Amino acid sequence: MTIERITSENYQDFCDMLYWRAKGKEEKAPIEDVPDELNDRNLYVYAAREEGRFVGWISLTYLPKVSRVKKGYVYVDELWVAEKYRNHGIAKALIAEADEMKTKLDATGIRLYVNENNPIAHNLYTACGFSGEDKAYFMEK
């Protein structure tokens, strides 16, 4: 297994994986343009390649803080691994990218939200050193 940062060069393979996740079948995904967001200095998307294709990904965002400390947080926006490839260390390898990003950016920490009805993800994050303090509500407008 290898972990790759998503760029314009491997974006088609990444889209193929997203299509596979959404449609349940592996085939070339139609794409128009590589999104400009991939060049955002605070967005990091990594994917795990196994058997010649991407089988999971993590999307990370660095959110700077305006304060005396001037250190922000790395946020895990999404983490997904294809069911066939779960329990093979892929999710932990992807989370390791968040740890590296935290170190590289000298961030205060890593934050994420996990649904309380998702015990598999909760157990994964706990095994990777995350701890929960309070329940939170996800709200959207």
Question: What do these predicted regions represent?
Answer:
Residues 1-14:
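A short beta-loop-alpha structural element at the N-terminal edge
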Residues 65-76, 86, 133:
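A conserved beta-turn-beta hairpin within the catalytic core of GNAT-like acetyltransferases
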Residues 108-121, 138-140:
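Conserved beta-strand-loop-alpha-helix junction that forms the acyl-donor binding cleft
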Residues 11-12, 16-29, 66:
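Helix-loop element at the rim of GNAT/NAT acetyltransferase active sites that forms part
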Residues 92, 116-135:
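Conserved active-site alpha-helix within GNAT-family acetyltransferase domains
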Residues 81, 87-100, 127:
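Conserved acetyl-CoA-binding loop-helix of GNAT-fold acetyltransferases
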Residues 26-47:
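Active-site rim helix/loop that mediates acceptor-substrate recognition in acyltransferases
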Residues 47, 53-62, 75, 80:
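Conserved beta-strand in the GNAT
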